[in-house]
Amino acid sequence: MFNKVTKSFQYGQHTVVLETGEIARQASGAVLVSVDDTVVLATVVAAKKAKPGQTFFPLTVDYIEKTYAAGRIPGGFFKREGKPSEKETLTSRLIDRPLRPLFPEGFYNEVQVVLHTVSVNPEIDPDIPAMIGASAALAISGIPFNGPIGAARVGYVDGQYVLNPTATQLKSSQMDLVVAGTENAVLMVESEAKQLSEDVMLGGVVYGHEQMQAAINAIHDLVRDAGKPDWEWQPEPKNEALIAAVTAAAQEKLVAAYQERQKQARTALLRNVYADVHAALAEQAAAAGQDAPDAVTVDNILFDLEARIVRGQILNGEPRIDGRDTRTVRPIEIRLGVLPRAHGSALFTRGETQALVVATLGTKQDEQIIDALMGEYRDRFMLHYNMPPFATGETGRIGVPKRREIGHGRLAKRALVSLLPAHEDFQYTIRLVSEITESNGSSSMASVCGGSLAMMDAGVPLQDHVAGVAMGLILDDGKFAVLTDILGDEDHLGDMDFKVAGTQNGITALQMDIKIQGITKEIMQVALAQAREGRLHILGKMREALEGSRGELSAFAPRMLTIKINPEKIRDVIGKGGATIRALTEETGTQIDISDDGTIVIASVDEAQAKEAQRRIVELTADVEVGQVYDGSVLRLLDFGAIVQVLPGRDGLLHISEIANYRIANINDVLKVGQQVRVKVIEADDKGRLRLSVKAIGGIEQQQAGGAEPAAQPESQAE
């Protein structure tokens, strides 16, 4: 019934198994990938024909995590998986990026790649198995695809590269790098690092590409034994006559339009050129008694012509679109403290790209709780990236963040996270929001720069400034040019887009997308060196604006006090049913977080209120010492004495014989409920019961006369 084909290969310390022919047989291609109990089902389906009028390649990649994979039932009312998590969205993008450039130009059939994580070992992230599975499913499907690709994760531990490190190994790794590519070329890199050099980062890319050949070879073996026949697909033949007509009508006008250095003016000129060409071609067709050429086809020819013009100018050493040479960073303007009530803010402008980045400090209660497949965890650092349509002078939908926004936010977060102070040194939760108010390329790197400045403006003690720069590459006939700080148009027209972020000491994040083959290690080396030059220039500008973190937090940020108590006293602070802690937070207006080890963090915008809460907690948890004198309050009267509270929650017996130096006939003659009285603890039994005395410090008559031994003060253990 089943024609099952299995291939396996060793991949670092893991064995990878590829299976096809048993599950999802009606898909164009389906492969089950297993790596040490992490199992991903990769499926591919492609439409046999493109939709009429289709003008772009409709590829969809969906990575889906099933909670049963971890032996769990989904939370929530419906107990069913819902909208994609951030992890699922980011992994979908990770898989999409190296696959998309490998489909042939002109192939507009709809293709859907779906990856289901159906079993998970917490030590093995499913993203690499999913990438390998997607590649294998496409390779055996017969769909036009210039693959397969391989993928690898690379760590860097004790000066050595580690292939596909486990989750435990990654905790001690200085690098978390994912690389994907074909046999001959790297196509995609995504990484974060702890201030590593360009050589170490590039070495990780090369190492990962070398090691992934094992995966590529296994996929070739799978195709040989289980591959379907290749589709009989040919691209539409080019209309050379139309290309010549468009070129003749538009070449000079496009060259002239690209002499305009200002984006909006240039865009207006280009729109006019497009309109003029369409009108001229329609007029020619009408004169010949023919229909006007397809508008989309003409637009595609014009775009290709634009690309040839811009790329040719740059490779010939002419100025770039905005007049710069290949190494110059656009003018930078920085303004700090832009928003008066925000905890920290920075307006970072680089040419026609601008980010308003805002830092907000919160408490442990503000941490993001993430219900991940691997288990629940908390995140104290969040970075949210928003790019509204007005940033590019357009109208559009505003609502749920799109995949691009989530991806850009994660890249900026990767760049900054390793520079954050240790949690024990700075216990605040940090949220950064990057509002892109103008965009003409490199907005994610503007978010990195603005994020570093906003946190320092908020008083977050970052280890160092972090800057990012987006680079581009144009390669043609053996000639190449690396472009520093690319514009949006240069991103679309170039062959490689890579973003590098880091400090003066090294790289903290690297993202690379390569659209063509033939980019060598040497070219990447030149590109990384030029990126370092640009990054150091930007860091210099940032230091001119703000040398380091401000010494004090914003007046509107919560103040935190930390005290340490005996863990056995936690119940005294919480009280029965949480009554004590609830009353304490409500009466002082503070937030109080209690850890199991007895660490208590008190947060309040009003420092005086925080100190009041601290004082009351110290009182609640103070130990009563025999021989110490305390200011007490009479709780109730007995025939033979009184019950006196010496500290919150601690009271003792004041016997009638220990009140005065004379005989008392009636307790009501000397004490009343609520009366303040100074007492000395003269005994505590093994059950914690206290015996008190007033007589031992002079008697009630002395206190009434105004003289008594001073009371003990509970010791604060504030850190």
From Swiss-Prot:
SMART domains: KH (SM00322), S1 (SM00316). GO terms for biological process: mRNA catabolic process; RNA processing. Residues 558-617 form the KH domain. Mg(2+) binds at D491, D497. It holds the Pfam family KH_1. Its cofactor is Mg(2+). GO terms for molecular function: 3'-5'-RNA exonuclease activity; magnesium ion binding; polyribonucleotide nucleotidyltransferase activity; RNA binding. Its EC number is 2.7.7.8. It is found in: Cytoplasm. GO terms for cellular component: cytosol. Residues 627-695 form the S1 motif domain. It catalyses: RNA(n+1) + phosphate = RNA(n) + a ribonucleoside 5'-diphosphate. It comes from the Bacteria. InterPro entries: ExoRNase_PH_dom1, ExoRNase_PH_dom2, ExoRNase_PH_dom2_sf, KH_dom, KH_dom_type_1, KH_dom_type_1_sf, NA-bd_OB-fold, PNPase. Keywords: Cytoplasm, Magnesium, Metal-binding, Nucleotidyltransferase, RNA-binding, Transferase. Coiled coil: none annotated. HAMAP family: PNPase. Belongs to the polyribonucleotide nucleotidyltransferase family. NCBIfam families: polynuc_phos, PRK11824.1. Involved in mRNA degradation. Catalyzes the phosphorolysis of single-stranded polyribonucleotides processively in the 3'- to 5'-direction. This is Polyribonucleotide nucleotidyltransferase. It comes from Bordetella petrii (strain ATCC BAA-461 / DSM 12804 / CCUG 43448).
